Amino acid sequence: MMPFLCSLASGSSGNALLVVSAGARVLVDLGLSQRRLKTGLKAAGTAPDEIDAVLLTHTHTDHFFTAAVGFCLEHQVPVYSAEENLRHLSRSLAGFRELGKAGLARAINGGTLQIGDLAVESFDVPHDSHGRALGFRLAFGPTRRRRTVAVATDLGHMPGECLRWFVDANAVVLESNHDAEMLRASGRPWNLIERIAGPWGHLSNEAAADALAEIVGRSHPGRVASIILAHLSKDCNTPQLALEAQAHLAHGRTHPIRFLAAAQWAVGPRIEV
């Protein structure tokens, strides 16, 4: 079986990304009910008992909440995240301490985490969650055919120290949250608009396009094969607008790039890595 990734859900109502290699199956975030999760996993050809780990980006409830605790306890799935995030969830999320008691809440303290044949590295991203917000770079396969996936779904801007983790990734999963004009005209309270558009909020389509242009420009030709636009706002964005913002990257390339806008309520296709 070819390694692949599959978005089970992406957005403010819940997030989960499945990454499958030859020797491991992991979820990046688990912000879904058990029913939605199991339905999504089945659609992606994966059983709950096959999940080896959850990589938690940050502590907001659309990325991890009470139902995830029950799933991880039932199927003995470890949750890896920053120590600060584990401490916060132990205080704020019902049942999370039970994961700690079961040895399933495990801190990422830098370096490389090995899960089966997946080598996982984490990096800090700018987002206004309690604890630390993380992105992940996952690598697998033999040295000469090494494949990589880089993920960051909630970040207010793309500093250089974050961007470097995406260079030469075969698959990039990056937030493209809102259209700036739709956000300004949304009728939301101005302080919320400022928070979303601010440097610790969420990437606009335009900011995502700028970051992706630099990522592709700094990568070896043909290395970036797939780009998944994530965490689209249901009120202040559309898949069409998010994809149109990337049009300059999609056309006229010697090595074509596949673009996909991840959906909130539909399981995405398998993207081979």
Outline where the language-model segments fall.
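Active-site environment of divalent metal-dependent phosphoester hydrolases
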Residues: 60-64, 87-89, 130, 157-160, ...
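Active-site metal-binding motif and surrounding structural segment of the metallo-beta-lactamase
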Residues: 35-81
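Short helix-capping segments at alpha-helix termini
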Residues: 45-47, 95-100, 144, 218-221, ...
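Cap/insert and terminal regions of metallo-dependent hydrolase folds
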Residues: 160-262
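Active-site neighborhood of phospho(di)ester-bond hydrolases with catalytic His/Asp-centered motifs
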Residues: 28-31, 51-59, 80-83, 150-153, ...
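Metallo-beta-lactamase
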Residues: 83-146
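Metal-dependent catalytic neighborhoods of phosphoester/phosphodiester hydrolases
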Residues: 65-75, 90-93, 237-244
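Conserved beta-strand hairpin/beta-sheet module of binuclear metal-dependent hydrolase folds
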Residues: 1-44, 132-154, 171
